[in-house]
Amino acid sequence: MATSNDIKNGTILKLDGNLWQTIEFQHVKPGKGGAFVRTKLRNVTSGKVVDKTFNAGAKIETATVDRSEYQYLYQDGDDYVFMDNSTYDQITVPGVVVGDAANFMLENQNVTVAIHEGAPLYIEMPPSVVLEITYTEPGLQGDRSTGGTKPATVETGYQIQVPLFLEQGTKVKVDTRTGDYLGRVNE
């Protein structure tokens, strides 16, 4: 059994019969009164986000989660198929569990899959990925100096905002947490 002082980002807690992933945490020591830990938790199964406060040192129950490297193979309807890089076993992960990670996953890409008691909980993507722009409107000659943005579709089908000077076929770096354009990649 752990205490609330052990909470870190990514910690999986068991509360009220559900599993919750810590998104944010803050240890607060007010000038008056006892210290506490303020957290933002995401329900692993439903995706619901709640704020919860724990007294400092309060006993909490954490869940054991195995994180392993998997290779994304293909999409099968609403499900996604991954292969364990060490055992070559294939697992099927429901689209609800994959969530927004689907916007940035390419076939044969390595991701981390978190598994609890044999069931996949969530997909951990790298902080950024390189994707190719498959469609965007051409930028107009006069627009290049304004610093504006335009919509662009990347190879996964996800739409991002990119600078006006970028063209179809350009590889760009995209933040997997926010979906924001980070920069152009020269290869």
From Swiss-Prot:
From the Swiss-Prot or TrEMBL record, state where the protein is found: Cytoplasm
Q: List the disulfide bonds.
A: none
Among the GO molecular function terms of this UniProt record, one is:
translation elongation factor activity
GO biological process terms, semicolon-separated: peptide biosynthetic process
SMART domains per the UniProt record, alphabetical: EFP, Elong-fact-P_C
Q: Which GO terms describe its cellular component?
A: cytoplasm
Which InterPro entries does the record match to this protein? Elong-fact-P_C (IPR015365), NA-bd_OB-fold (IPR012340), Rib_uL2_dom2 (IPR014722), Transl_elong_fac_P/YeiP (IPR020599), Transl_elong_KOW-like (IPR013185), Transl_elong_P/YeiP_cen (IPR001059), Transl_elong_P/YeiP_CS (IPR013852), Transl_elongation_fac_P (IPR011768)
The answer, when asked if Nucleotide-binding is one of the entry's keywords, is: no
Grouped into one coarse class, the protein's main location is: cytoplasm
Sorted alphabetically, the keyword list is: Cytoplasm, Elongation factor, Protein biosynthesis
Is Aminoacyl-tRNA synthetase given among the entry's keywords? no
Q: In this record, what's one Pfam family? A: EFP
Its UniProt pathway annotation is:
Protein biosynthesis; polypeptide chain elongation
Ranges in a coiled coil:
none
- Family as reported in the entry's similarity comment: Belongs to the elongation factor P family.
Describe its function.
Answer: Involved in peptide bond synthesis. Stimulates efficient translation and peptide-bond synthesis on native or reconstituted 70S ribosomes in vitro. Probably functions indirectly by altering the affinity of the ribosome for aminoacyl-tRNA, thus increasing their reactivity as acceptors for peptidyl transferase.
Which NCBIfam families does the protein's record reference? efp, PRK00529.1
Q: What name does the UniProt record give this protein?
A: Elongation factor P
Q: What gene is this protein translated from?
A: efp
